[in-house]
């Protein structure tokens, strides 16, 4: 793996999608080739799976096991079609959710057997693992407030995963805490209830040492200094 692989994680409304785009823009300003993907999704097959998982009118009876397998089917396609080739070219990959989401949501949230979850993830990703995972954390109250605000702007877009009860999301949050405790070198928890600028500054401090180890880009935006 010649490039750099960064993932964003967090419960709903944590701001990870916004921060992923801000980081992409900043890295591009420094001259790096950056690709941002979302999960589930990121490929034509993955986007079809995403619709089935989140927005389809026919997914109400979906079982936790089916959800687990579909998530990882999308992931397996993304890893092989997009992530591995881009990393081999030396590019920076930013992924809005990756396998930690499956551990947190399907493992802890849906209460599936964690060892089974890990084995299925292993099939999907193999040795393609992020170097840095940024876990954005907000309180349940802020998460709920942001979700309501987002749903108000998109009233006709149903998201099945956002319809779970509060106990489910509490289990997900606990799952993320367990993941961070298990892999503290990779997973960094950031308080994300502040301004997006302050959160981005904290993210940049973690990313900067990693990009310093990459080959220096040959071209940079005008007026942008090298790392």
What are these regions (language model features)?
Residues 19:
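Hydrophobic positions on the alpha1 helix immediately C-terminal to the Walker A/P-loop
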Residues 2-5:
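Pre-Walker A (Motif I) flank of P-loop NTPase domains
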Residues 16:
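Conserved lysine of the Walker
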Residues 30-125, 202:
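ATP-dependent small-molecule kinase phosphotransfer cores
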């Amino acid at each position: 793996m010649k490039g750099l692989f960064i993932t964003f994680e967090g419960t709903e409304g944590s701001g990870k999608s916004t921060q992923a785009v801000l980081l992409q823009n900043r890295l591009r300003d420094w001259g790096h080739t950056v690709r941002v993907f979302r999960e589930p999704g990121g490929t034509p097959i993955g986007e079809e799976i995403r619709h089935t998982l989140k927005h389809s009118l026919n997914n109400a009876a979906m079982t936790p096991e089916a959800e687990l397998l579909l998530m990882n089917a999308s992931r397996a396609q993304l890893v092989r079609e997009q992530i591995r080739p881009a990393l081999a070219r030396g590019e920076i990959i930013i992924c809005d959710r990756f396998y930690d989401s499956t551990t947190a949501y399907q493992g802890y949230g849906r209460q599936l057997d964690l060892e089974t979850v890990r084995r299925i993830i292993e099939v999907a990703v193999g040795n393609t693992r992020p170097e840095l995972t940024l876990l954005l954390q907000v309180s349940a109250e802020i998460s709920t407030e942001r979700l309501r605000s987002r749903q108000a702007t998109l009233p006709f877009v149903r998201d099945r995963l956002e319809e779970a009860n509060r106990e489910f999301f509490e289990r997900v949050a606990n799952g993320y805490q367990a993941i961070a405790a298990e892999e503290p070198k990779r997973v960094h928890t950031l308080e994300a209830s502040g301004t997006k600028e302050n959160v981005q500054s904290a993210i940049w401090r973690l990313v900067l040492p990693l990009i310093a180890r990459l080959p220096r880009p040959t071209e940079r935006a005008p007026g942008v200094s090298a790392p």
